[in-house]
């Protein structure tokens, strides 16, 4: 059975959209939903259409802020992310807060990593041809400007909660088709 289902990443947002009538909150939820779906596709142009021209991302961890800055920096980040084939993920949200200015999500991020990619990221990989599961706790603040575009993805992460080699049977077919075709 597949260890992740990327479509579950945006289930909580879809559920909130079903019960939210405030137009601005719907706009904020909808742009983050579109962003998540485009990232999973992966469709770089569609993904970048959700990001403002003056975007400034912050990825907070033990080493400080490592997020890309500016639209070009964000585009380069996502192009590399897609090329790494690490976009196969499931963000298991257990909290979602929306207001007129931002969406805040919290949950466990489950990400599939090709062994070579995991090795480049500094993880202890004993087989670069294998596939690995990386799990971390994340809180993400998604500010949205008055035009309805994402101005940042400010994430705070716990670091690895789990990192392990996977059996082929645990990999979703879409991952196998993209990474091992």
Describe the predicted segments one by one.
Residues 20, 32, 59, 63, ...:
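Residue-level detector of alpha-helix boundaries and kinks
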Residues 1-49, 53:
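Short, low-complexity N-terminal intrinsically disordered segments enriched in polar/charged residues
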Residues 1-23, 82-88, 92-181:
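A beta-strand edge to alpha-helix "cap/lid" segment located at domain peripheries
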Residues 31, 35, 77, 138-140:
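Alpha-helical packing segments of well-folded alpha/beta enzyme cores
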Residues 26-27, 44-116:
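A solvent-exposed, acidic/Ser-Thr-rich amphipathic alpha-helical stretch
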